[in-house]
Amino acid sequence: MAFLNNVEIGNKGERIARNYLRLRLYKILETNYRRKTGEIDIIAKKGGYIIFIEVKYRNNTNKGLPREAVTAFKQRQIKRTAEMYIIENKLSCDMRFDVIEILGKRIEHIKNAF
């Protein structure tokens, strides 16, 4: 059995999350949006909202729930990076911050997570 490194695990989780979102009619605008302030896994649009999504994937809860890895520090990074995206794209819209938690085969979409 091959073991995946952290990048491969992250890529797998993000791929699952993108498919999940597309099936629910979200429009994916960006993936892995990076700036000096941080990174946003997925930026999507639905129902007049721009949604900044952090994806956390784990096979088990040995290190806690995936959502617990979205610390206050990580939330601040995502918010600062989202501000950069809004400014760069000259957007004026409602936005929200979601977490997609993937634990094994279970997916939970936590809307307005922070």
Where are the model-predicted features located?
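Solvent-exposed, charged helical/coil patches
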Residues: 1-23, 62, 68
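A short acidic/basic microdomain associated with nuclease active sites
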Residues: 23-36
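Conserved beta-strand positions that form and line the central face of beta-propeller blades
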Residues: 32, 69, 109
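Structural motif
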Residues: 37, 48-52, 94, 107
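Conserved catalytic cores of phosphodiester-cleaving nucleases, focusing on short active-site segments
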Residues: 40-61, 78
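Catalytic cores of nucleic-acid endonucleases
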Residues: 57-105
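Short, low-complexity, polybasic intrinsically disordered segments
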Residues: 102, 106-114
